[in-house]
């Protein structure tokens, strides 16, 4: 596959999400228990970038990640980040990304749906309820993510 074969074929209509957004907060709600938790710590880092050409890049990294020295530590690093990219489209209050590269191979080839709203220079995002590969033991969860326009 060449880079040109994964590029969006046409520009997305101008929208309020286009541009670069910096992570402000990331939390998760657990459907079964009502629990909320911050799986990436109180100060995770990340960005989401929406291009006019219809590409999205999403990266979220846990607070305090350190270089790994063992195979087990390298394995643990997989659950302390989320990263994916692909072409996106907007449908009402949803953005839908057709994932072509991801930190977790099970996402490649899928469509990831996110609900969003823009309030001033903030992008507030939530996921549908789903089992997240980073913490499957929690069952159905929903992520709530807040970004600030850069």
Model-found features: residue ranges?
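Lipid interaction determinants
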Residues: 2-83, 90-150
């Amino acid at each position: 596959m060449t880079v040109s074969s994964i590029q969006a074929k046409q520009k997305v209509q101008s929208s309020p999400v286009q541009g670069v957004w910096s992570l402000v907060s990331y939390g998760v709600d657990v459907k079964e228990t009502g629990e909320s938790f911050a799986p990436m710590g109180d100060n995770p880092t990340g960005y989401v970038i929406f291009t006019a050409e219809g590409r999205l890049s999403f990266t979220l990294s846990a607070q305090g990640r350190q270089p790994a020295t063992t195979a087990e530590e390298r394995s643990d690093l997989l659950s302390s980040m989320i990263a994916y990219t692909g072409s996106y489209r907007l449908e009402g209050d949803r953005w839908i990304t057709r994932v072509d590269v991801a930190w977790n191979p099970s996402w490649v080839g899928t469509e990831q749906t996110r609900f969003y709203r823009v309030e001033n220079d903030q992008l507030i995002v939530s996921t549908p309820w789903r089992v997240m590969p980073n913490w499957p033991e929690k069952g159905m969860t929903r992520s709530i993510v807040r970004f600030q326009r850069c």
